[in-house]
Design a protein with these regions (language model features):
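A cytosolic small-molecule/anion-sensing beta-strand core signal
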Residues: 40, 59-60, 81, 106
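A short beta-strand-loop-beta hairpin characteristic of the jelly-roll/cupin
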Residues: 64-76
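Short beta-strand segments in beta-sandwich/barrel cores
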Residues: 35, 44, 62-67, 85, ...
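Cyclic nucleotide-binding regulatory module and flanking cytosolic helices
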Residues: 3-41, 90-91
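Short phosphate-coordinating micro-motif centered on Lys-Gly-acidic
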Residues: 45-50
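Cyclic-nucleotide recognition modules
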Residues: 76-121
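Glycine- and acidic-residue-biased ligand/ion/polar-headgroup-sensing regions
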Residues: 53, 57-64, 83
């Protein structure tokens, strides 16, 4: 079963809406230095518990972010659409295993940039 929840630890909304970030410049960085990854519908960009060190910029398609709880229930914790940034922000920043899975709900194109590259921004 899938459940909807408010995943407070996931703060990509804050990242996407940050007034301190020049998003046009940031998008340009992803398109110039990022690696294009094409995912088919139902392929995973990240699986829960995997290590991740990339942030994605979605140029086409839609991603669903889900988390499986200790009872085995799958919770929808967010979506990322075209022109959104997508990652498991808390695990990326804290350098821990992914707390969510990021799955393509349509065919998707996403430019992946390592956190180390973004830190130089």
């Amino acid at each position: 079963s899938l459940y909807l929840c408010n995943y407070k630890a996931f703060s990509m909304d804050k990242f996407n809406a940050s007034k301190n970030v020049d998003t046009a410049r940031l998008e340009k960085l992803f398109l110039e230095k990022g690696t294009l990854k094409v995912l088919k519908k139902n392929e995973y960009m990240v699986r829960q518990n995997d290590k991740t060190n990339h942030i994605g910029f979605v140029t086409s398609g839609t991603f669903r972010l889900t988390r499986i709880d200790t009872n085995g229930n799958e919770w929808i914790v967010g979506y990322s659409f075209e022109n959104d940034f997508v990652c498991d922000y808390p695990s990326l920043i804290n350098r821990t295993s992914a707390t969510v899975s990021i799955k393509a709900t349509t065919d998707c194109e996403v430019y992946l940039l390592p956190l180390s590259e973004l830190n130089q921004f």
